[in-house]
From Swiss-Prot:
GO terms for biological process: ribosomal small subunit biogenesis; rRNA processing. SUPFAM superfamilies: PRC-barrel domain, Translation proteins. The keyword Cytoplasm applies. The PRC barrel domain binds ribosomal protein uS19. Belongs to the RimM family. GO terms for molecular function: ribosome binding. Binds ribosomal protein uS19. This is Ribosome maturation factor RimM. Residues 98-177 form the PRC barrel domain.
């Protein structure tokens, strides 16, 4: 399951929900699309997920309406939970442009700079509208006293190329970030 957003407060009398989007693809939130709601930390517990169907989504207002939620009381039960979509459904609904990737496809890729393996992407975080690769440093570099984990901004200055078929990200200047972490 992929995290699409975080559900905020109840809005209005018809069960509207403020949605704090975690995705770059709001067009996936269409009427009739199946989504799941669960605590944010529920990734590994399938029993935590409750399924819903989207009634509508107003992107300008970040308002989500689910088909079976029609009262503020029912909406409040979902406050502070995560909105999830299956990986297959996400890939079916979201059309990627050249150079765009799903986070789930980038996690696990090797980070390489000048033929030196720096580590693996373990997570992607968005901070102030910038995506960062959270990289677990390779053991040999950690043994040399470098940080166990470091961040690489997803910017051209650092990221040269993403090769999904080779399962690697080639970088430039990322080792300097590691050395200064």
């Amino acid at each position: 399951m992929l995290l699409v957003g975080r559900i905020g407060k109840s809005v209005g009398l018809n069960g509207g929900l403020k949605l704090h989007l975690e995705s770059d693809f709001p067009e996936c939130l269409k009427k009739g699309v199946k989504v799941s709601v669960a605590p944010i930390n529920a990734f590994s517990r399938a029993s935590s997920f409750k399924d819903y169907v989207i009634h509508s989504y107003e992107h300008a207002k970040n308002l989500l309406f689910l088909e079976t939620i029609h009262t503020p009381e029912k909406a409040k039960e979902l406050t502070n939970l995560g909105l999830f979509m299956s990986e297959a459904e996400s890939k079916k609904l979201c059309v990627l442009k050249e150079g765009e990737f799903f986070y789930c496809d980038l996690v696990g890729l090797s980070v390489v700079e000048e033929n030196e393996f720096l580590g693996k992407v373990i997570e992607i975080q968005r901070i102030s509208q910038i995506d960062y690769f959270l990289v677990e440093t390779t053991k040999s570099l950690v043994e040399k006293g470098l940080a166990k984990i470091f961040l690489i901004p997803y910017r051209d200055f650092y990221i040269q190329e993403i090769l999904l078929q080779d399962k690697k990200i080639t970088t430039h200047n990322a080792k300097t970030l590691l050395e200064n972490s």
